[in-house]
Amino acid sequence: MDAYGPKIGVMHMMGITICAVGRLRQKPEAVLVSNYVDRFNKLGRKLGFGLANLIEVEDKNGSGISAEAILLEKAIPKKSIICVLDENGKTLTSPNLASFLANCRDNSKNNVTFLIGGADGIEEGLKKKADYALSFGKMVWPHSLARVMLAEQIYRSATILLKTPYHRN
């Protein structure tokens, strides 16, 4: 089987969820995230993916990282592969992320959920429950930009799997 193409006869539609602390509201980053998610959703069905979506959680009491972890955990769809975004996580190339998503889909995973913490990151207990930890490099990024970067990489993954000219090596 080609890691970049859907299996013949694949009927399972694997969802992709981005769960993030805080709300972008009407910030420019919200427009970018929405744009990339919409673009992925238009291509994803051709590849056997369900819809990608963004779930934003907000600790209105300001209780901190532990309260954020509880809200994030409640937002994770059942039977989901959990990937935390963390500066100490594994760095992947764009084609590697595309292969990862294709492998999850081909192994009939229900959903892949990416978790993005707030200003203090993700609570250690929740990190330990994750199946994977991914990083955008050793630099720390604001959670609003991390959402944009992740949404773009998910869309880019679809373009890689479909072999469109969007991604150039």
Tell where the protein language model's regions lie, with residue ranges.
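N-terminal beta1-alpha1 ligand-phosphate binding loop
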Residues: 9-44
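Conserved RecA-like P-loop NTPase ATPase core
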Residues: 18, 83, 117, 150
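Short hydrophobic segments within beta-strands
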Residues: 19-21, 55-57, 115
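Short glycine-rich anion-binding loops that position phosphate/pyrophosphate groups of nucleotides
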Residues: 24, 87-90, 118-121
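S-adenosyl-L-methionine/SAH cofactor-binding core of RNA-modifying enzymes
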Residues: 45-112
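Short, acidic/small-residue loops that bind anionic groups at enzyme active sites
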Residues: 106-115, 137-143
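Structured adenosyl-cofactor binding patch, chiefly the S-adenosyl-L-methionine
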Residues: 120, 124-168
